[in-house]
């Protein structure tokens, strides 16, 4: 077995772009998702090492210090971070001439040839679900025999092997939490709406929804929700509860954990027996009966992608959600005492000044506890990217998804709505949602009830206002 380094490379200060972040950008407040995609394959390679640089405040010099310890380096990359990640790979190769190094992630899965052509020092890239592709490299198998691999042969020519079949039995994958225990400091991972410290993991891959903007189902996970067995999930939570007694919350980061409702309820009941607090992603259509089962068995929070308050925009992006159903679902959650973190996207196809106003009013009406407002990001490999090129919504001048400091930009524009108008609407959205007497009172009440929460919210407040000031500087 090759001595293998799995690396989420150093990047922008505070850049949440790891192998677990759906939107790669510097957040409004300090936030880091776990590098779960890398941890999963690290668990398949005995003796490997996982380094998640940014949350652990590691710079390039820290990584290079041990470069000669490894035979193989596997870096996770993304469209926004690719140029920076290539420079890190080149530095690793300069420090260890015998090192084989390559990339995994959605960026290289959909653009394997172009990615390899960016630097002759990139030895390989892996497509879609790369777990067993990388394991076979680490085992020393001939690269020409490994499905799902694109690579540079001994002559320097680029070769593309047949794609790897998507994994069907998710219980074949080992637990990720032992890798967290071995290689990560979990206190370094923050998500503003989750308790701290938290742990996130997947209980399945894929999503049956067809949202045009969503990256993973269109590039690496597919549109069939493939799940781990209930017993397998519960066994990992049981392990993690003992391995990390300090953890206050578990988060299931499947694209839509609630799609299989009988399974959701079965897992909930088992978690209830364990007595753990947990949260998950959900679509805004979960029946009240299922919500009650979840709530009664330890569910605290749902992360819900509302995206827009305009029904036509939801049709345009194939969200498969009705505004009236979302309203009823949200009302049920409020009545059951389930906290909601709502996410919204501005700049989607069909957006106008009027629909932005409609979405802001919708968010204020349904009133989730906290929100995230993102900008529509046309990642290569998505339907949104194809549409943007076809209709001229994306131009070279504004094609970057982030600015040089890692802040998310507004790459799309429309004949009736400019990049700048879309970008500036994010700040307006946040101000009009949070700067209301009831919302301010709720935050103060939360702080008064918990000294730990008071310290945390004060820190987040400082970071949030600094973020808004930074956005204003970008505009001016």
Language model features by range: what are they?
Residues 1-6, 27, 47, 65, ...:
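Radical SAM enzyme core and accessory elements
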Residues 2, 143-146, 152-200:
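N-terminal [4Fe-4S]-dependent radical SAM core
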Residues 11-20, 112, 154, 209, ...:
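Flexible glycine/acidic-rich beta-alpha junction loops that bind and position SAM and/or redox cofactors
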Residues 37, 41-169, 375-381:
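Glycine-rich beta-alpha loop elements in corrinoid/cobalamin-binding modules
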Residues 176-341, 348, 353, 358-361:
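Radical SAM [4Fe-4S] cluster-binding motif and immediate context
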């Amino acid at each position: 077995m090759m001595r293998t380094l799995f690396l989420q490379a150093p990047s922008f200060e505070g850049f949440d772009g790891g192998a677990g972040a759906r939107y790669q950008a510097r957040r409004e407040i300090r936030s880091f998702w776990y590098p779960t995609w890398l941890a999963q394959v690290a668990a398949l390679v005995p003796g490997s090492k996982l380094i998640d640089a940014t949350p652990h405040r590691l710079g390039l010099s820290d990584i290079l210090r041990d470069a000669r310890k490894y035979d193989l380096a596997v870096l996770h990359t993304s469209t926004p971070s690719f140029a920076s990640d290539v420079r890190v790979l080149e530095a690793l190769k300069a420090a260890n001439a015998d090192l084989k190094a390559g990339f995994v992630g959605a960026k290289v899965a959909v653009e394997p040839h172009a990615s390899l052509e960016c630097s002759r020092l990139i030895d390989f890239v892996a497509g879609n679900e790369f777990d067993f592709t990388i394991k076979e490299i680490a085992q020393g198998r001939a690269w020409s025999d490994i499905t799902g691999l694109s690579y540079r042969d001994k002559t320097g020519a680029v070769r593309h092997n047949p794609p790897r079949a998507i994994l069907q039995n998710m219980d074949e994958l080992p637990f990720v939490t032992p890798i967290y225990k071995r290689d990560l400091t979990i206190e370094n991972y923050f998500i503003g709406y989750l308790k701290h410290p938290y742990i996130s993991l997947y209980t399945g891959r894929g999503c049956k929804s067809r949202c045009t903007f969503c990256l993973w189902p269109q590039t690496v996970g597919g549109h069939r929700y493939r799940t781990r067995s209930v017993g397998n999930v519960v066994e990992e939570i049981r392990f993690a509860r003992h391995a990390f007694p300090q953890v206050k919350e578990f988060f299931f980061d499947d694209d839509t954990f609630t799609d299989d409702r009988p399974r959701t309820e079965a897992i909930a009941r088992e978690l209830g027996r364990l007595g753990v607090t947990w949260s998950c992603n959900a679509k805004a259509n979960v029946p009240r009966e299922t919500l009650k089962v979840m709530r009664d068995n330890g569910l605290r929070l749902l992360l819900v992608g509302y995206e827009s308050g305009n029904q036509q925009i939801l049709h345009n992006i194939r969200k498969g959600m009705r505004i009236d159903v979302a309203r009823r679902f949200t009302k049920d959650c409020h009545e059951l005492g389930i906290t909601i973190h709502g996410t919204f996207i501005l700049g989607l196809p069909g957006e106008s000044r009027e629909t932005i106003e409609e979405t802001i009013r919708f968010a204020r009406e349904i009133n989730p506890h906290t929100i995230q407002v993102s900008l529509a990001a046309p990642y290569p490999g998505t339907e949104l990217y194809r549409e943007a090129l076809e209709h001229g919504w994306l131009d070279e001048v504004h094609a970057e998804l982030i600015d040089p400091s890692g802040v998310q930009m507004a790459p799309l524009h429309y004949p009736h709505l400019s990049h700048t108008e879309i970008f500036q609407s994010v700040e307006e959205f946040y101000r009009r949602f949070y700067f209301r007497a009831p919302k301010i009172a709720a935050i103060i009440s939360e702080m008064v009830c918990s000294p730990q929460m008071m310290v945390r919210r004060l820190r987040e407040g400082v970071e949030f206002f600094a973020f808004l000031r930074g956005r204003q500087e970008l505009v001016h």
